[in-house]
Design a protein with these regions (language model features):
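Vicinal oxygen chelate
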Residues: 1-10, 13-22, 41-43, 53, 66-118, 139-144, 149, ...
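A generic structural micro-feature
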Residues: 9, 57-62, 94-97
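Intrinsically disordered, low-complexity regions enriched in small/polar residues
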Residues: 13-17, 32-33, 38, 56, ...
Length: 174
């Protein structure tokens, strides 16, 4: 097996993630509230015959979809919102004992986003954003999208790539 320095290939960037949707239109509307825009509307696309095999699914898959992106990051990763019609997707009831899919987004001014989104009808998991200055988190909050995915919005201190939670809150190793 080759080592990364010997390879003639490399992963370049994170491209997209698929969000399974109960209702593609409702899901698009939710992500538009968060500031996403449609990059490629695929709600009336007829998928190629071999697409099911590519995903390891039945041959004749069907779905309505849209690629969405954040305007502030035009070349960044996209959300591929898909309402699968064939085969169908199960959406189990949400339980506090089962961790859902979590998508986290950096946000400038989480407190303002929280207030505006709440006024627009978005329900958050807590009545106010969390503040954890000891780990570099200015504010963070979480809500659910229409499909049960947990959406985290986080604002970090300027210059931080990630929070310092792994170094501040650590089990004693002795």
């Amino acid at each position: 097996m080759s080592t990364p320095s010997q390879r003639t290939w490399q992963f370049e960037s994170f491209y997209h993630t698929i969000i399974n949707a109960r209702d593609v239109d409702e899901t698009i509307a939710f992500y538009e509230l968060l500031g996403f825009e449609i990059l490629d509307d695929r709600r009336s696309t007829v998928w190629p015959d071999d697409q099911g095999a590519f995903f390891g699914l039945i041959p004749d898959i069907k779905g309505r979809a849209a690629l969405m992106r954040l305007p502030a990051d035009p070349n960044g990763p996209m959300l591929d919102i898909i309402e699968w019609q064939v085969p169908r997707v199960d959406f189990p009831a949400r339980s506090p004992e089962v961790v859902p899919r979590v998508l986290a987004f950096r946000v400038e001014n989480v407190k303002a986003a929280f207030q505006e989104l709440r006024a627009l009808g978005v329900t958050f998991t807590k009545p106010q954003p969390n503040e954890m200055p000891e780990v570099g988190i200015v504010a963070s909050a979480a809500c659910e999208d229409p499909n049960g995915n947990l959406i985290e919005i986080i604002e970090l201190e300027p210059g931080l790539r990630h929070s310092k939670i792994g170094t501040v809150y650590r089990e004693d190793e002795g």
